[in-house]
Amino acid sequence: MKISILSLFPELYETWINHSIISNAIKNNQVTIEIINFRLYTNDKHKKVDDYQYGGGAGMVLMIEPIVSAIRAIRTPNSYVILTTPKGQVFNQELANEFVSKYDHIIIIAGHYEGFDERINYYVDAQYSIGDFVLTGGELPSMVISDAVIRLLDGVISSSSLESESFNNYLLDYPVYTRPVVFEGHQVPDVLLSGHHKNIADFRKQQQEMITKKNRPDLYQKYLNSKK
């Protein structure tokens, strides 16, 4: 898979790309990541990428020309182009799985300032948000979306780890423990020390159901519906 991110601040991605699982995935040729500064695609001699909004209002708006030029320079017939914006559909694990199964090249546009000229929607395939809150720019959302997708690629993470993670089958992950057995009076549940695999599996499933029902009743209802 190839992921292209259009951003005004490419340097913000350096640590994310060069460490841990993402770095290993790049080294193992499981994913290619390119960060493109769309400021390079402006025809303005001052490299201007934003301007005042028509009708008045606070904040500067990203101009459409440099972004569209950047998209056209890298887009192929198989590319899926998405915009990060609080106005978009909320990105989730189901969409991450869908991206992996359907697309070989994802282009993510990370915005800044007051947002995009609305006409950008004629040149993208979808808009996505990572939650009901507003951030300074689209760099973090673009990393979040990319990270969620990359870790699902074959071989990036072991299949057993993926199977037990939160949101698999609409359930949040079960609690995990390590040494010491007792810390300041708080003890690891006895069942996890028993060595009885079925009892451990049952305990973990019960914990998943309980935690999901308490913290994410919306997901818990989906889980119940999936069992019908």
UniProtKB/Swiss-Prot annotation:
Disulfide bonds: none annotated. The keyword Transferase applies. S-adenosyl-L-methionine binds at residues 111, 130-135. Keywords: Cytoplasm, Methyltransferase, S-adenosyl-L-methionine, Transferase, tRNA processing. Its EC number is 2.1.1.228. CDD domains: TrmD-like. It comes from the Bacteria. Pfam families: tRNA_m1G_MT. GO terms for molecular function: tRNA (guanine(37)-N1)-methyltransferase activity. It catalyses: guanosine(37) in tRNA + S-adenosyl-L-methionine = N(1)-methylguanosine(37) in tRNA + S-adenosyl-L-homocysteine + H(+). InterPro entries: Alpha/beta_knot_MTases (IPR029028), tRNA_m1G_MeTrfase_C_sf (IPR023148), tRNA_m1G_MeTrfase_TrmD (IPR002649), tRNA_m1G_MTases_N (IPR029026), tRNA_MeTrfase_TRMD/TRM10 (IPR016009). It is found in: Cytoplasm. GO terms for biological process: tRNA N1-guanine methylation. Its main location: cytoplasm. Specifically methylates guanosine-37 in various tRNAs. Homodimer. Belongs to the RNA methyltransferase TrmD family. This is tRNA (guanine-N(1)-)-methyltransferase.
